[in-house]
Swiss-Prot record:
The protein, known as: Glutamate 5-kinase
Gene Ontology CC terms: cytosol
Enzyme class, broadest EC rank: transferase
EC number: 2.7.2.11
Alphabetized UniProt keyword annotations: Amino-acid biosynthesis, ATP-binding, Cytoplasm, Kinase, Nucleotide-binding, Proline biosynthesis, Transferase
Any one GO biological process: L-proline biosynthetic process
Amino acid sequence: MMKRQFEDVTRIVIKIGTSSLVLPTGKINLEKIDQLAFVISSLMNKGKEVILVSSGAMGFGLDILKMEKRPTNLAKQQAVSSVGQVAMMSLYSQIFAHYQTNVSQILLTRDVVVFPESLANVTNAFESLISLGIVPIVNENDAVSVDEMDHATKFGDNDRLSAVVAGITKADLLIMLSDIDGLFDKNPTIYEDAQLRSHVAVITQEIIASAGGAGSKFGTGGMLSKIQSAQMVFENKGQMVLMNGANPRDILRVLEGQLLGTWFKQIEEVRHD
């Protein structure tokens, strides 16, 4: 029987999606953010190095500006995200401070990690922050990112961004929190007999074909982007856990080896009992 072993994991990237931070009503889930800050601070106190990739700028902005739905106009989307990013970081800073943990903000665009000079700079920034015991909180710089073909600077969504961050920081593990329990063999919202995949060693065409669907009205990510992120993690010889973010304390249980979520790790590196 395969056993998850995370004893040697030191550097962890945790990605949390908008659906985990914003309630269905559009209000901010303060309890969830507090639990997340507690878990990350606890890990830091145990000697772990944690980087948080956080969506939510759009959700926070919609809440602050009392908007019912995401604007369709790009400029307005960027404006809402810009307002929301400030509010989100302010809240993170306040709540993490309660646990005596300092945070910083890193906003990225895709071109930053494409060019060697800027990639070296951002890598050094991560290393400096981590060495100071600070939790870098990463998001895409939505206010300036564009996806036009002649000057594409968007990552697409924060699922992919988290995989990129895990790669450039050489993280031991990416934990992706979502509103789903993990990867199923078929759509659990349609098929009652859908089974959760505990371990995925190879991203097959069958898995890619079965993944799809849109994210929530507040976010952009779906299952396909999570599968693509796992593929990126595999290319960097890393590992990833996709799990439900309803209870952030489950992160601690996963690191203890409990079989929550779906573990993405290539088979040649898997240990057996």
